[in-house]
């Protein structure tokens, strides 16, 4: 009996339907895209004739610019949709907005939205490939992919590597996406933060451990990721005080000494310097924070190519 392979995912909303082999292929292809970005002329015609709409219903600097550059590097046309200047402010529904944009013959959507699950709705309404650029607390898959790519770039593989993620896990779509992705690629993930900022459901994911002890999390880690305290998403009562948080959970030189020698430091940005991460570590020799930003473009080029052009 012939066993058919699962179909290629049409969208990148999260990692639920993505097999490890496809994820590895995305990262392999990012190497090719990285080579394109090293050329004197950093452009290829791979998406010529296609239109990508970046629909951001929430503020973004790195992700929006990275996606728009990625699409243009591959010769796609880009429609940049800003929710604040749209008919949404006049009461138009999300569904109607998406259907109007689809009528302009858009080939794919890149979506950021403050509501968890919004990217899934837009995929349903548009009938087009959708890349989730962050929806509420739920998922930010391309950030996790570029984090994985940065770690792989350093070590050659994620297999057997320990990744510690420290901070506001509860409100972080980045933490959730990394917790889903990295074990699929062979890494061990340890999430650490105050008990009030640790959602219990993540402990049930394969390859993921949850602790309130940052030293335990960082011990023997090959990569240490600091997360921003998302105070804009918090109500009162999550933290006793910021000072107490800094003393216990800040990723600084003292905490980093618990990690593997030469462990790399990551942060998805934006940084709150000297809150979740010390300036000495953020700017130090083990930091790969700017490398993450650089790698984001190659990874997002790979994702766009995979969804719009790639063939099995």
Curated annotation (Swiss-Prot):
Carbamoyl phosphate binds at residues 62-63, 112, 140, 143, 269-270. Its EC number is 2.1.3.2. L-aspartate binds at residues 90, 173, 228. It catalyses: carbamoyl phosphate + L-aspartate = N-carbamoyl-L-aspartate + phosphate + H(+). Pathway: Pyrimidine metabolism; UMP biosynthesis via de novo pathway; (S)-dihydroorotate from bicarbonate: step 2/3. The keyword Transferase applies. Catalyzes the condensation of carbamoyl phosphate and aspartate to form carbamoyl aspartate and inorganic phosphate, the committed step in the de novo pyrimidine nucleotide biosynthesis pathway. Belongs to the aspartate/ornithine carbamoyltransferase superfamily. ATCase family. Heterododecamer (2C3:3R2) of six catalytic PyrB chains organized as two trimers (C3), and six regulatory PyrI chains organized as three dimers (R2). This is Aspartate carbamoyltransferase catalytic subunit. It comes from Deinococcus geothermalis (strain DSM 11300 / CIP 105573 / AG-3a).
């Amino acid at each position: 009996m012939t066993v058919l392979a699962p179909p290629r995912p049409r969208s990148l909303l999260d990692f639920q339907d993505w097999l490890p082999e496809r994820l590895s292929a995305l990262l392999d292809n990012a190497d090719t895209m990285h080579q394109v970005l090293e050329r004197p002329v950093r452009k290829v015609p791979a998406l010529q004739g296609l239109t990508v709409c970046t629909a951001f219903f929430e503020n973004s600097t790195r992700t929006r610019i990275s996606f728009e550059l990625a699409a243009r590097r591959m010769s796609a046309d880009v429609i940049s949709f800003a929710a604040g200047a749209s008919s949404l402010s006049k009461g138009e529904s999300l569904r109607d907005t998406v259907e109007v944009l689809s009528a302009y013959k858009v080939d794919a959507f890149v979506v950021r939205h403050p509501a968890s699950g919004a990217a899934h709705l837009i995929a349903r309404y548009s009938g087009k490939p959708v890349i989730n650029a962050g929806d509420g607390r739920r998922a930010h898959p391309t950030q996790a992919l570029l984090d994985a790519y940065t770690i792989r770039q350093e070590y050659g593989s994620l297999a057997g590597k320990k990744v510690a993620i420290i901070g506001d896990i509860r409100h972080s779509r980045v933490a959730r996406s990394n917790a889903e992705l990295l074990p699929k690629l062979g890494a061990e993930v340890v999430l650490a933060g105050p008990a009030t900022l640790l959602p219990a459901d993540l402990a049930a994911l394969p390859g993921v451990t949850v602790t309130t002890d940052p030293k335990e999390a960082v011990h023997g880690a090959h990569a240490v990721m600091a997360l921003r305290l998302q105070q804009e998403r918090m109500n009162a009562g999550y933290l006793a005080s910021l000072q107490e948080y800094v003393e216990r959970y800040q990723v600084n030189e003292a905490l980093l000494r618990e990690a593997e020698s030469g462990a790399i430091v990551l942060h998805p940005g934006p940084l709150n310097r000297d809150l979740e991460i010390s300036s000495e570590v953020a700017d130090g020799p083990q930091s790969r924070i700017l490398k993450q930003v650089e790698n984001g473009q190659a990874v997002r080029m790979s994702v766009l190519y995979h969804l719009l052009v790639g063939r099995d």
